[in-house]
Amino acid sequence: MPKGKKAKGKKVAPAPSVAKKHEAKKVVNPLFEKRPKNFGIGQDIQPKRDLTRFVKWPRYIRLQRQRSILYKRLKVPPAINQFTQALDRQTATQLFKLAHKYRPETKQEKKKRLLARAEQKAAGKGDAPTKRPPVLRAGVNTITSLVENKKAQLVVIAHDVDPIELVIFLPALCRKMGVPYCIVKGKARLGRLVHRKTCTSVAFTQTNPEDKGALAKLVEAIKTNYNDRYEEIRRHWGGGILGPKSTARINKLEKAKAKELATKLG
């Protein structure tokens, strides 16, 4: 073989036509036309998305949402922030169970009682004065005077009073006068106890002898959670939680700073 000439490789014979795979062509129905959607402005109807953020809510809902966001974003002073720490569910259930026994009478019950008493008097059976049963006392002014006179055994305050200024002083007053207090969820729930729509606060003044043990247990648990922790509660600020946009912006700036520092050092 002369130098400089390369030997040519043998060519492989092409595969027979039988061995070739016949790709099945997709049968396209000419009646079905392709109509790609255009989601530009003024074109096709937009796909379903979660547009909750853009809904024009009723005014009262808008205020609720704004208030909750402001409480997260702004720095909330301890006096207001303490109302976010409600009583735990188990203790609250026991408390409401006991409070249910001391609900004040309704207008219908009072009418029925007075009618029975009047009938008794008319029958000539005499009108002996009856002892007032122990019931819950409700309302800020009533409870303030009870606490000041140290007549309240336990004060229950609602966490969602609006405006909060109505009850903001009560925890400090209760602690000063040595009265056990607690914060529970729901002014509406307290309202149901005293036959009203809502109620800012209720207080126990007297209880029946059979319930004194249950009340003493509750008072002990509540004192541990609220009265004894007053100094800790007084120092604890709330809020200051940034939103997702602000957090993302801060993270982006920090990444850029870290990158810049790395290039300077490297």
Curated annotation (Swiss-Prot):
Keyword hit for GTP-binding: no
Top-level taxon: Eukaryota
Compartments, as annotated in UniProt: Cytoplasm
GO-annotated cellular components: cytoplasm; ribonucleoprotein complex; ribosome
Pfam families per UniProt: Ribosomal_L7Ae
GO molecular function, one term: RNA binding
Gene Ontology process terms (BP): ribosome biogenesis
InterPro entries, per database record: eL8/uL1-like (IPR050257), Ribosomal_eL30-like_sf (IPR029064), Ribosomal_eL8-like_CS (IPR004037), Ribosomal_eL8/eL30/eS12/Gad45 (IPR004038), Ribosomal_eL8/Nhp2 (IPR018492), Ribosomal_eL8_euk (IPR001921)
PROSITE patterns per UniProt: RIBOSOMAL_L7AE (PS01082)
Record key words, sorted: Cytoplasm, Ribonucleoprotein, Ribosomal protein
Biased composition (Basic residues): 1-11
Biased composition (Basic and acidic residues): 116-130
Region (Disordered): 1-28, 105-134
Family stated for the protein in its record: Belongs to the eukaryotic ribosomal protein eL8 family.
Function: Component of the large ribosomal subunit. The ribosome is a large ribonucleoprotein complex responsible for the synthesis of proteins in the cell.
Subunit text: Component of the large ribosomal subunit.
Protein name per the record: Large ribosomal subunit protein eL8
Organism: Takifugu rubripes
